[in-house]
Regions:
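Bacterial N-terminal signal peptides that target proteins for export
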Residues: 1-10
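N-terminal secretory/targeting leader peptides
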Residues: 23-116, 125, 130-336
Length: 336
C-alpha cells in the first residue's frame, strides 16, 4: 500500500510539472532593460506579462529592469548570441551593432510627441530598412516607439548656447548625438546610464540629456538642478528579441512574440505622453528643479549648427548616407 501511495505521489508530481501526457514545461524567457521605476521599465514589465498571457503559459516571461542583466551593450551582445531572449533599448545604443539605427538620434529630426514619434517609425521607409539590416545581425526588431523629446539637465543655469560650450555632457554612444554636442562646442562623453547619478554628483560630468520622466523617476534632479527645454533630440526605443531564439520557436509562438511586442508598443504610446507631462509638473511643484525654455533664437543656432555639422557628416558617411536620405524622404512625406 505504501508503494502504491509513493508512485501515486510521483505521478502527481510529474503531472504538475507538465512532463506527462505530452505536455511541455514552460520555457523561461528574460526581458531586460537598463532603467527602473520609470515608463521604460513599465513597458518591459508589460511585454513580459503579455508574452506569458498570450502563450497561455508556454512562455514564462520575466522582466529584469534596472540593468540587472548588464549594460545595454552587454545585453545586446547576449541577445545576438541567443542567450538573452528580449530587451528594450534606446536606439542609440544599437549604433555599434547596427549603425543605421543610430540615425534616429540625428538632432531635430522627429516630432516631440511620443505617439507621433511611434507613428513616424511605423510609416518610415528608413525604419523598415533598419529592421532588415538588424535581422542580418541576429536582432529581430519587433518595433520602435517614442519616449519623448530630450532636453538638457545641468548643474548650472543655461540661458544661451554659449553656456554649454566647453562643458562635459554624458551622451549615448551614438555618432549623431556626439556630433551634435561637438557642433555646439560642448564635450560629449559616452557613459553607461548606471554611472550617471554618481558622475553628476561628483562633477565628472556637468550635464546630460533626457526626457522629464527619466530624470524624475531616476532622481537625477537631486544632483543637477537645472532643466532647460531644448527638445533637440527624439528618444526612440526599440523592442527586440533574439533572432536565433525566435526562429527556434514553433510558428504559433513566433506570432505570440510579435503580438505581445506590438501590444506593448501600443501601451507605451498610452503611458509615455502622460509620464512626461506628469514628471515635469511634479518637478516644478516640488521646487526640486529649475525649469526653463531655451530662447527660440538659441534653438535656431543649435539647429543651424547641426544641419551644417552632424547632418552633413552623416550624409557623407558611406555606411549611413542611404538611411539619412530615406529619413529625409520620410520627413517630407510625414509633414506634407
Amino acid at each position: 500500500m505504501k508503494a502504491i501511495s509513493k508512485w501515486a505521489f510521483v505521478a502527481a508530481s510529474l503531472l504538475a510539472a507538465g512532463t506527462v501526457f505530452g505536455q511541455t514545461p514552460a520555457m523561461n524567457v528574460l526581458i531586460g532593460n537598463s532603467t527602473a521605476n520609470d515608463a521604460q521599465a513599465a513597458i518591459n514589465v508589460r511585454f513580459a506579462e503579455l508574452l506569458t498571457k498570450y502563450s497561455n503559459g508556454r512562455l514564462a516571461a520575466s522582466s529584469r529592469t534596472g540593468g540587472s542583466l548588464g549594460t545595454n551593450s552587454q545585453m545586446l551582445s547576449t541577445l545576438q548570441a541567443g542567450a538573452l531572449q528580449g530587451m528594450i533599448i534606446p536606439t542609440g545604443f544599437m549604433a555599434s551593432a547596427v549603425p543605421e539605427i543610430g540615425m534616429f538620434d540625428l538632432p531635430f529630426l522627429l516630432p516631440g510627441d511620443p505617439a507621433k514619434m511611434t507613428e513616424f517609425t511605423v510609416r518610415s521607409k528608413a525604419a523598415a530598412r533598419m529592421r532588415e539590416i538588424a535581422e542580418q545581425k541576429g536582432i529581430h526588431v519587433i518595433g520602435f516607439y517614442g519616449i519623448g523629446s530630450q532636453s538638457l539637465l545641468t548643474r548650472f543655469p543655461v540661458t544661451k548656447l554659449a553656456d554649454i560650450q566647453g562643458k562635459l555632457f554624458r551622451v549615448i554612444p551614438s555618432p549623431p548625438r556626439a556630433g551634435a554636442y561637438k557642433d555646439w562646442g560642448a564635450v560629449p562623453r559616452s557613459m553607461d546610464f548606471a554611472e550617471v547619478y554618481t558622475a553628476l554628483q561628483q562633477g565628472t560630468i556637468v550635464g546630460i540629456e533626457n526626457p522629464p520622466d527619466v530624470i524624475y523617476k531616476m532622481k537625477l534632479y537631486e544632483v543637477a538642478k537645472y532643466f532647460t527645454r531644448t527638445e533637440h533630440s527624439a528618444f526612440v526605443m526599440a523592442i527586440l528579441v533574439s533572432k536565433k531564439w525566435r526562429d527556434a520557436l514553433p510558428k504559433d509562438l513566433q506570432e505570440v512574440v510579435i503580438r505581445a511586442g506590438k501590444d506593448a508598443i501600443t501601451y507605451a504610446d498610452e503611458i509615455n505622453t502622460k509620464a512626461q507631462a506628469d514628471a515635469l509638473a511634479a518637478m516644478r511643484k516640488e521646487g526640486s528643479i529649475t525649469v526653463s525654455d531655451m530662447p527660440a533664437a538659441e534653438i535656431r543656432k543649435m539647429r543651424d549648427l547641426n544641419r551644417e555639422g552632424v547632418w552633413k557628416s552623416m550624409k557623407n558617411d558611406p555606411q549611413r548616407s542611404a538611411i539619412v536620405k530615406l529619413l529625409e524622404e520620410d520627413i517630407a512625406d510625414y509633414f506634407k
